[in-house]
């Protein structure tokens, strides 16, 4: 039994897809356990970029099984489109498996997402308008439609009719919006179900059988710990649990079967959308990091907010997700800066604190306390070991590990597979 969980430790966009792709080389099964097509991950293979939103990064390894677990909310339209994209690129998807217990995103979820966000006015939370939240709402309310239901024509028709009637009353009475028609949705989405049914199965059985057989299983999280609905900057969060604990619920494996948790972070911080961000930069340095790091959302295309590395956030993520190893990405983006800063604590009303407050009002008053380190001017994109890094960059990497309190297993100096440097093999240490 050998398993590794990959989680984002910031607000998403940390490079989880790249690290999952890297670790997938030694895995036999790769599984997603939460989120939906609101997540975006970019994988670079032989210099070519592939952008995925729903299908696990392991799909590029035809001999390995890629799993969409029961905790994922699946938009069949997006899934069929992504499958077609991969097929057009010559990528086989015969190794994909989709949980029959995963819930389905339907057009009324997306419409409701938009209406709810518009109604918030200046209090928007920055949703991607993908219907993720409303789909999880239906799941919790026990009125959701699962993949298993989508494949059964009579059950799908019955549940869609009931749900659509309820949602249309909401659209008309509360939001003064146009109702949706049953026939078009039913025909379109039932057809999508038939297109994907070859991949549908009980993925909990596949995952547990693999673990019991001693195979290496890699669990791939979406978003990040700071977007977790319980542990993140609520309400500016996603509607699921990206923390490592989400694996057990979202994939159907027990907690005793998790061996390692790899936390992925960037050498700085970024986030898309609204919400607290203590180390956010509004100056030329911030703009430089955004441009050099190409900090624009994979899903939305929106410019990401950027800031200095926040070790307070990272220690929070380490604690609530049980992180055992750290993967530090995008060190190259900081090249050329005379000084680099790391937030080591916050000043809250004149008191130094080293924890991340739950209160949004307190977070507004938190001022980052920085430790300044000398920067480096060298181009490090060709570095292939820690010793090859300039001394100042090497010191930065070491200081990050010290402040977070987790050993760094890999560091990356660019988006390519070959730009990921191993300090300690995660698989070998299990």
Swiss-Prot record:
Extent of the signal sequence: none
Compartments it resides in: Cytoplasm
Positions annotated to bind IMP: 13-16, 38-41, 128, 142, 223, 238, 302
Binding residue positions for Mg(2+): 13, 40
GO cellular component terms listed in the entry, alphabetical order: cytoplasm
Primary site of residence: cytoplasm
Pfam families: Adenylsucc_synt
Pathway given in the UniProt record: Purine metabolism; AMP biosynthesis via de novo pathway; AMP from IMP: step 1/2
Family designation: Belongs to the adenylosuccinate synthetase family.
Complex formation: Homodimer.
Annotated protein name in UniProt: Adenylosuccinate synthetase
Source organism: Streptococcus pyogenes serotype M12 (strain MGAS9429)
């Amino acid at each position: 039994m050998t398993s590794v969980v990959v989680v984002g430790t910031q607000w998403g966009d940390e490079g989880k897809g790249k690290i999952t792709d890297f670790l997938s080389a030694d895995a036999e099964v790769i599984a997603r356990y939460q989120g939906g097509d609101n997540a975006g991950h970019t994988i670079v293979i032989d210099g070519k970029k592939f952008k995925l939103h729903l299908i696990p990064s392991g799909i590029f390894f035809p001999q390995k099984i890629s799993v969409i677990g029961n905790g994922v909310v699946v938009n069949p339209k997006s899934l069929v489109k992504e499958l077609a994209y991969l097929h057009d690129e010559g990528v086989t998807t015969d190794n994909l498996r989709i949980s029959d217990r995963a819930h389905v995103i339907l057009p009324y979820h997306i419409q409701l997402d938009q209406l709810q966000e518009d109604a918030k006015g200046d209090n928007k939370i920055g949703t991607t308008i993908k219907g993720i939240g409303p789909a999880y709402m239906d799941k919790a309310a026990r009125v959701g439609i699962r993949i298993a239901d989508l494949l059964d024509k009579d059950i799908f028709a019955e549940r869609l009719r009931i749900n659509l009637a309820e949602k249309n009353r909401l659209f008309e009475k509360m939001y003064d919006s146009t109702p949706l028609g049953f026939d078009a949705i039913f025909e379109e989405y039932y057809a999508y179900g038939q297109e994907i049914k070859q991949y549908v199965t009980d993925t909990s059985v596949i995952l547990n059988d693999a673990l019991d057989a001693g195979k290496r299983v890699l669990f791939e999280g979406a978003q990040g710990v700071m977007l977790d609905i319980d542990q993140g900057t609520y309400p500016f969060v996603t509607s699921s649990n990206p923390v490592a604990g989400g694996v057990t619920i979202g994939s159907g494996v027990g907690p005793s079967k998790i061996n390692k948790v790899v936390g992925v972070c960037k050498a700085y911080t970024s986030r898309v959308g609204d919400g607290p961000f203590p180390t956010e930069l509004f100056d030329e340095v911030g703009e430089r990091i955004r441009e050099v790091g190409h900090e624009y959302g994979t899903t939305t295309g929106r410019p990401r907010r950027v800031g200095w590395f926040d070790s307070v956030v990272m220690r929070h993520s380490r604690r609530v997700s049980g992180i055992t190893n750290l993967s530090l990405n995008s060190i190259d983006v900081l090249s050329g800066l005379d000084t680099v800063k790391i937030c080591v604590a916050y000043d809250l009303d004149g008191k130094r604190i080293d924890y991340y407050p739950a209160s949004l009002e307190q977070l507004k008053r938190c001022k980052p306390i920085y430790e300044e380190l000398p920067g480096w001017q060298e181009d490090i994109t060709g570095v292939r070991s820690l010793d090859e890094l300039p001394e100042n960059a090497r010191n930065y990497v070491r200081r990050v590990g010290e402040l977070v309190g987790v050993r760094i297993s890999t560091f990356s100096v660019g988006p390519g597979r070959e730009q990921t440097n191993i300090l300690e093999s995660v698989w070998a240490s299990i």
